[in-house]
C-alpha cells in the first residue's frame, strides 16, 4: 500500500514538473486553472441560489454573473500571456501609483458593504482596489529586487525601502478597513525578500514589529476584537459574534466523508452568511465532503507548486524578475488560501478573503486570472531562454507567444 502511494506521488510529481518538451507553455498550469475555475462555477451556482432568489427573484443571477466573469477571466489570461515581462517591469511603478490612487478614490466614493468601503462601482461589476494593489505591489517588488539585489542582501536600507511602500498601502487599506489584504501583502513581501536573500535578523525585527502592530489594531478596534474572541470560542455566542463560524463548522460536520451531494446543502439556505463568497469552502465541504475538499486543496497546492517550480527555474537561469514574481505569486496563492480555509474551519479569525479562482467576485477573479497569465508568460520566456539562449529568445519574444509556438511546431 505504501509503495503504491509512493508510486502515485511520483507520477503526480513527474506530471507537474516535466511537461512535454516541444511545448512552449505550461499545459499543466492551464488545466489546473481551468479545473479550479469550473469547480468554482459549480459551487458558486449551488451556494448562491437562495440569496439570489431573495435579492433579485432570479435563482441563477449570481451564477450567470460568475460565468460571465469566468469568460472575461479567460480572455484576460489570453491577452496577458502575450505581454512580454519587460513591459510589466517597465510599468511597475506607474501601476503602483495607480493602485494608490484607486485606494484613495475608494475611501472617497467607495461602496460600503458590512461597514467596509472596499468597492468602486463600475456598472457591470464592483472594482476592489485592494486586489489591484496586491498585484501591483508584487510586480513592483520583483522589479525592485532585481534593481537593488545586492543592496537588499547587504544593507538594512535596501531591506526597508519596500517596507515603506507597503506601509503606504497598509495605511490606505486599514482606512477602509481591510486588515486581511494587508496581512496577505505583508506575508508575500516577507517571502519575496527572503527569496532575495535578506538577512535573518531583519526578518525577526520586521515580523516582531508587524505582530505588535496587528495586535494593537485588534485590541483598539472593537469589531476586530469581537472577531478574535468569537474565533477562539464561537460556541460561547453561537447566535451573535460566533454565528458565522458555528454555521460554517456545522456545514463541514454535515459533509462528513462523501458530502450531501451537489445542491443539497442546508447551510446555504441563508443560515450561513456569505455562502457564495468568503465561505464558499464551507458549502463545498457540506456538499462534496472530505473527498471534495481534499481534491480542491490538492488543485490549489498544485497551482502553488507550479508557481514555485517556475520561479525556481527562472532564478536558476538568471531571470530574476520572473523568478521573484513567480515565487511571490506562489506565496500569495498559498497564504490567501490558508486564511480563507482557516477562517472557514475556525483556525484563524475571519478576514474576508476570497478562495483563489473559486469564490464569487469579479475583481478577485480578474486579478487572479492576470496573475495566472503572467505566470504562463514567465514560464514561456524561461523555456525560450533555455532553448534558444538570451539573444534569440528576446527576438522570439517580440514576435509573441503564438509565433513562437508555430515556429516550434514546424521544427
Swiss-Prot record:
GO MF, any single term: lipid-linked peptidoglycan transporter activity
Annotated Pfam families: FTSW_RODA_SPOVE
Protein name: Probable peptidoglycan glycosyltransferase FtsW
Transmembrane residue ranges: 29-49, 66-86, 90-110, 122-142, 155-175, 178-198, 200-220, 290-310, 321-341, 355-375
Membrane topology: Multi-pass membrane protein
Recorded metabolic or biological pathway in which this protein acts: Cell wall biogenesis; peptidoglycan biosynthesis
Skewed-composition ranges (Acidic residues): 392-411
Purpose: Peptidoglycan polymerase that is essential for cell division.
Keyword line: Cell cycle, Cell division, Cell inner membrane, Cell membrane, Cell shape, Cell wall biogenesis/degradation, Glycosyltransferase, Membrane, Peptidoglycan synthesis, Transferase, Transmembrane, Transmembrane helix
Membrane topology (Periplasmic): 50-65, 111-121, 176-177, 221-289, 342-354
Biological process, per Gene Ontology: cell wall organization; FtsZ-dependent cytokinesis; peptidoglycan biosynthetic process; regulation of cell shape
Catalysed conversion reaction: [GlcNAc-(1->4)-Mur2Ac(oyl-L-Ala-gamma-D-Glu-L-Lys-D-Ala-D-Ala)](n)-di-trans,octa-cis-undecaprenyl diphosphate + beta-D-GlcNAc-(1->4)-Mur2Ac(oyl-L-Ala-gamma-D-Glu-L-Lys-D-Ala-D-Ala)-di-trans,octa-cis-undecaprenyl diphosphate = [GlcNAc-(1->4)-Mur2Ac(oyl-L-Ala-gamma-D-Glu-L-Lys-D-Ala-D-Ala)](n+1)-di-trans,octa-cis-undecaprenyl diphosphate + di-trans,octa-cis-undecaprenyl diphosphate + H(+)
InterPro entries linked: Cell_cycle_FtsW-rel_CS, FtsW, FtsW/RodA
Membrane-side (Cytoplasmic) residue stretches: 1-28, 87-89, 143-154, 199, 311-320, 376-411
Family of this protein: Belongs to the SEDS family. FtsW subfamily.
Region (Disordered): 391-411
Amino acid at each position: 500500500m505504501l509503495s503504491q502511494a509512493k508510486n502515485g506521488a511520483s507520477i503526480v510529481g513527474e506530471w507537474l514538473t516535466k511537461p512535454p518538451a516541444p511545448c512552449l507553455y505550461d499545459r499543466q498550469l492551464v488545466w489546473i486553472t481551468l479545473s479550479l475555475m469550473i469547480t468554482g462555477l459549480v459551487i458558486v451556482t449551488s451556494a448562491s441560489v437562495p440569496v439570489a432568489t431573495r435579492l433579485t427573484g432570479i435563482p441563477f443571477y449570481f451564477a450567470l454573473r460568475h460565468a460571465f466573469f469566468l469568460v472575461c477571466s479567460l480572455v484576460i489570461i489570453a491577452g496577458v500571456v502575450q505581454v512580454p515581462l519587460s513591459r510589466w517591469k517597465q510599468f511597475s511603478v506607474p501601476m503602483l501609483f495607480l493602485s494608490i490612487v484607486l485606494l484613495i478614490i475608494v475611501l472617497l466614493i467607495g461602496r460600503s458593504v458590512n461597514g467596509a468601503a472596499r468597492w468602486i462601482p463600475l456598472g457591470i461589476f464592483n472594482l476592489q482596489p485592494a486586489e489591484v494593489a496586491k498585484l501591483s505591489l508584487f510586480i513592483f517588488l520583483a522589479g525592485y529586487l532585481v534593481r537593488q539585489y545586492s543592496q537588499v542582501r547587504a544593507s538594512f536600507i535596501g531591506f526597508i525601502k519596500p517596507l515603506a511602500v507597503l506601509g503606504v498601502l497598509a495605511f490606505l487599506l486599514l482606512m477602509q478597513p481591510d486588515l486581511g489584504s494587508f496581512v496577505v501583502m505583508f506575508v508575500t513581501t516577507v517571502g519575496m525578500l527572503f527569496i532575495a536573500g535578506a538577512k535573518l535578523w531583519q526578518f525577526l525585527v520586521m515580523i516582531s514589529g508587524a505582530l505588535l502592530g496587528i495586535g494593537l489594531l485588534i485590541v483598539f478596534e472593537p469589531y476586530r476584537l469581537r472577531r478574535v474572541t468569537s474565533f477562539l470560542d464561537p460556541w460561547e455566542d453561537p447566535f451573535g459574534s460566533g454565528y458565522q463560524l458555528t454555521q460554517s463548522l456545522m456545514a463541514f460536520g454535515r459533509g462528513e466523508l462523501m458530502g450531501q451531494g451537489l445542491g443539497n446543502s442546508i447551510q446555504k439556505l441563508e443560515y450561513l452568511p456569505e455562502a457564495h463568497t468568503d465561505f464558499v469552502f464551507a458549502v463545498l465541504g457540506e456538499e462534496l465532503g472530505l473527498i471534495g475538499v481534499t481534491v480542491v486543496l490538492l488543485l490549489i497546492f498544485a497551482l502553488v507548486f507550479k508557481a514555485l517550480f517556475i520561479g525556481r527555474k527562472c532564478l536558476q537561469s538568471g531571470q530574476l524578475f520572473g523568478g521573484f514574481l513567480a515565487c511571490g505569486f506562489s506565496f500569495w496563492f498559498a497564504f490567501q488560501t490558508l486564511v480563507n480555509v482557516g477562517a472557514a474551519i475556525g483556525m484563524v479569525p475571519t478576514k474576508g478573503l476570497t478562495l483563489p479562482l473559486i469564490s464569487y467576485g469579479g475583481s478577485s477573479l480578474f486579478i487572479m486570472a492576470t496573475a495566472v497569465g503572467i505566470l504562463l508568460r514567465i514560464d514561456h520566456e524561461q523555456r525560450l531562454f533555455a532553448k534558444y539562449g538570451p539573444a534569440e529568445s528576446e527576438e522570439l519574444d517580440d514576435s509573441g507567444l503564438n509565433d513562437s509556438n508555430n515556429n516550434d511546431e514546424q521544427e
